Amino acid sequence: MKKRQNTYAVNSDTCAQLRCIINLYILLANFDFHEAYFLLFFNLVSPTALILRFLPLLSPPFCLPWSDTIFSSSFVGLILSNNLIPVCTLRSLICSKSREPSKISVSSGIENFAT
């Protein structure tokens, strides 16, 4: 009998929604409110519902302030593209503390997964 992995399988719509939310957080962290507005109101079907759905994964008490946050964009992209999201892994990637404060960049690679 195979041991079941502790992961959550999600459909492609959920992955696309989560990618939009991650991009939205990056834009807001960089104070790019104009782009965030277009992402939020023109690309998401129900922005309020989506934010409420994924906010517990991406906000305190699980996350540190955005100034101390670093993204491992290639690994996040790998997880999302495989449609398997281990919640603890995703939370630790998004919320891990950077040793050197750095500005989060939209061109870090995550934007490639938003389409």
Curated annotation (Swiss-Prot):
It is a single-pass membrane protein. The chain crosses the membrane at residues 69-90. One of its GO terms (cellular component) is membrane. Its main location: membrane. Keywords: Membrane, Transmembrane, Transmembrane helix. It is found in: Membrane. Partially overlaps PRP21. This is Putative uncharacterized protein YJL202C. It comes from Saccharomyces cerevisiae (strain ATCC 204508 / S288c). The lineage of its organism: Eukaryota, Fungi, Dikarya, Ascomycota, Saccharomycotina.
